[in-house]
């Protein structure tokens, strides 16, 4: 099982969880340093619809990220609230799409 980032992260993208991950499995559409340069007052607008994601294939379930998340967005997959179950698939799809983008074109 892996950890999942859910709705409280959307448009927040707080990166406090990133440096505590021992396997570097937390990523997003923007790099953590890019996010940190966005002024706090502009984040909701500039990060609308964006969030961070945990790679379910790399996560070692140590829980370090869950304890560090200031918005309470990270859950053990088995403890994900019912209203946020869709985020399990959203997290996995982010990494599937990313792998497809990086795969060399077949000829």
From Swiss-Prot:
Q: What positions does the entry give for [4Fe-4S] cluster 2 binding?
A: 21, 59, 62, 65
- Under which name does UniProt file this protein? Ferredoxin Fdx8
State where [4Fe-4S] cluster 1 binds.
Answer: 9, 13, 17, 69
| Gene3D superfamilies from the UniProt entry | 3.30.70.20
**Amino-acid biosynthesis as UniProt keyword:** no
InterPro entries this protein is in?
4Fe4S_Fe-S-bd (IPR017896), 4Fe4S_Fe_S_CS (IPR017900), 7Fe_ferredoxin (IPR000813), RnfB_subfamily (IPR050294)
Q: What keyword terms does UniProt attach to this protein?
A: 4Fe-4S, Electron transport, Iron, Iron-sulfur, Metal-binding, Transport
Function (record text):
Ferredoxins are iron-sulfur proteins that transfer electrons in a wide variety of metabolic reactions. Fdx2 can receive electrons from both FdR_A and FdR_B ferredoxin reductases, with a preference for FdR_B compared with FdR_A, and transfer the electrons to the cytochrome P450 CYP260A1.
Q: What sequence ranges are listed for the domain 4Fe-4S ferredoxin-type? A: 1-31, 50-79
A Pfam family (short name) is: Fer4
Entry note: cofactor: Binds 2 [4Fe-4S] clusters.
| Example GO molecular function | metal ion binding
From which source organism is this entry?
Answer: Sorangium cellulosum (strain So ce56)
Q: Which cofactors go with this protein?
A: [4Fe-4S] cluster
Q: Say yes or no: keyword 4Fe-4S present.
A: yes
């Amino acid at each position: 099982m892996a950890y999942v980032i859910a709705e409280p992260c959307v448009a927040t993208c707080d990166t406090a969880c990133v440096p505590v991950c021992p396997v570097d499995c937390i990523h997003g559409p923007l790099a953590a340093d890019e996010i940190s340069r966005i002024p706090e007052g502009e984040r909701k607008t500039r990060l609308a619809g964006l969030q961070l994601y945990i790679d379910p294939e790399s996560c070692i379930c140590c829980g370090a990220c869950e304890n560090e998340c200031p918005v309470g967005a990270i859950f053990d997959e088995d403890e994900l609230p019912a209203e946020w179950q869709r985020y399990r698939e959203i997290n996995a799809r982010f990494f599937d799409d990313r792998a497809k983008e990086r795969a060399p074109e077949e000829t």
